[in-house]
Amino acid sequence: MKRRDVLSLLVLGSLIWVAGTILYAYRANVIFETTSSRYWWAFATSPVFSAILCVVILRRRRIPLAHWASAMLLLAIPGMLGEAVVLSNLSTFMPRLHAASGGPYGAFLFTTYALVLALAEIVTLRAQSSVQNTAQSRSAG
């Protein structure tokens, strides 16, 4: 991966985290403190939306499939570090969210990061396997 890609993915990851944190600072109470069905709907759809957004970013940046795991980490790390600060200072960064909702919010975050990173790892492993199979076919032939 090019140095420019590394830097741009870190910057994009930071921007996505800032936008998401601002959104949840104002709207998290509507998701986490209203109805169970609203929470579970958001719990199911937000990770999928995040994964789609990240896939679009990697495709538009033309990141080779074999580099998706590291590229996705570059997108995720700013948010993971930022969320550690947010979760440890929940009342400061999420003033509309009750402290008791910190656990569900944390679970929500972990699920999103897990789905996005697992998807990237699967894509990377398949790409590497495909390259190895092609190389073995050429050497056998």
What does each of the following model-derived ranges do?
Residues 19, 40-58, 80-83, 111-115:
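Core segments of alpha-helical transmembrane spans in multipass integral membrane proteins
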Residues 60-77:
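Loop-to-transmembrane helix junctions at the membrane interface
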